[in-house]
């Protein structure tokens, strides 16, 4: 948790729009739940792998600065319904769900069967 706080402070110091809502969501949703890979890259503002496909493809969760920028520009409000195209391991959907709250809804669409199965499994846990 402290590592995420430190990351958010660095992003804010760099001028990124880390709002209280975004900060709360990123502190509440544990990214480790969405990947079995090392989090060191993510904590250093790099993408982190969440899935390697049988064909050799690598799927990643976006770097934190991209996640913060996306969430900021979505202008999310409690109770909103959100359609997310591209699952990114389920992490961004979980962040959005945290921000829109129990009165909101998040629907995720992804063209990759492997990604969809990964997200289903991770969101069940």
Describe every region a protein language model picked out:
Residues 1-99, 114-122:
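Class I SAM-dependent transferase core
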Residues 105-110:
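Conserved SAM-binding motif I beta-strand of class I
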Residues 125:
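Conserved SAM-binding strand-loop segment of SAM-dependent methyltransferases
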């Amino acid at each position: 948790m402290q590592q995420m706080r430190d990351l958010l402070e660095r992003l804010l110091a760099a001028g990124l729009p880390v709002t209280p809502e975004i900060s709360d969501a990123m502190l509440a949703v544990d990214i480790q739940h969405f990947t079995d890979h090392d989090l060191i890259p993510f904590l250093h503002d790099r993408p982190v792998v969440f899935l390697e496909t049988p064909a050799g493809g690598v799927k990643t969760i976006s770097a934190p600065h991209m996640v913060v920028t996306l969430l900021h520009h979505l202008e999310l409000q409690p109770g909103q319904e959100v359609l997310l195209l591209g699952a990114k391991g389920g992490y961004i959907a979980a962040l959005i769900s945290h921000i829109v709250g129990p009165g909101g809804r998040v629907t995720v669409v992804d063209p990759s069967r492997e990604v969809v199965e990964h997200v289903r499994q991770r969101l069940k846990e």
